[in-house]
């Protein structure tokens, strides 16, 4: 399959149709704005093949954030992973250029990675998850070695599953770089 804008558009349409078609009462938010028990994830399960999976939404810990996804771009990296899996991640929830609204957060979450206050209802984006020094690039742009970092949308699948923005919800974990973009 040749990867071009028409192919990507068709893939996105198929994923969105699958997510809409698989909606269940458990994963649909109630009119009161309550958080559903499950979320849908467009999981790349084989080369050039997505399955819409439904997973329980994990409990939000003291340092975690649950975000309702509002949108996500399709990057060339997503297309490369879809076509060739160069990172050996399958199965994987792709999507690393997304944004959404905080619907629940742990009691220890007070500020984003730039020091801006955050609260439920704020719009956020993610960047890297630094395993070593989370401030590696925050204050010195000459320090661009991100070899010890992970990216949502390019994380191996685990027991959380909500690791990419191609989903209803994304689960942002302690140590993640995220920014409040509400303004």
Predicted regions and their residues:
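Protein-protein interaction and targeting regions used for scaffolding, dimerization, and localization
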Residues: 1-35
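Extracellular beta-rich ligand/substrate-recognition surface
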Residues: 42-50
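Cytochrome P450 core scaffold surrounding the K-helix E-X-X-R motif
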Residues: 77-82
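Glycine-rich beta-strand-centered segment in the early N-terminal region that forms part
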Residues: 56-72, 85-138, 182
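Short structural boundary motif marking the start of a folded domain
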Residues: 35-42
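NAD(P)H dinucleotide-binding glycine-rich loop of Rossmann-like/cofactor-binding domains
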Residues: 111-112, 130-183
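Short Gly/Pro-enriched turn/cap motifs at secondary-structure boundaries
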Residues: 45, 56-57, 89-95, 157-162, ...
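Conserved hydrophobic/aromatic beta-strand scaffold that supports enzyme active sites
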Residues: 52-57, 99-101, 169-171, 178
């Amino acid at each position: 399959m040749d990867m071009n804008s028409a192919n990507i558009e068709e893939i996105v349409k198929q994923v969105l149709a699958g997510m809409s078609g698989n909606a269940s009462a458990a994963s649909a938010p109630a009119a009161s704005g309550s958080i559903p028990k499950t979320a849908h994830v467009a999981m790349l399960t084989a080369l050039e093949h997505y399955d819409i999976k439904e997973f329980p939404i994990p409990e939000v810990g003291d340092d975690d954030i649950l975000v309702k996804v509002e949108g996500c771009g399709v990057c060339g990296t997503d297309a490369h992973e879809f076509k060739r899996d160069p990172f050996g991640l399958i199965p994987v929830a792709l999507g690393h250029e997304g944004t959404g609204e905080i619907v629940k957060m742990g009691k220890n979450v007070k500020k984003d990675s730039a020091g801006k206050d955050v609260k439920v209802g704020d719009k956020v984006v993610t960047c890297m998850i630094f395993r070593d020094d989370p401030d590696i690039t925050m204050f010195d742009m000459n320090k661009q070695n991100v070899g010890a970092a992970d990216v949502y949308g390019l994380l191996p699948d685990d027991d959380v599953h909500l690791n990419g923005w191609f989903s209803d919800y994304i689960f942002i974990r302690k140590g993640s770089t995220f920014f409040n973009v509400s303004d």
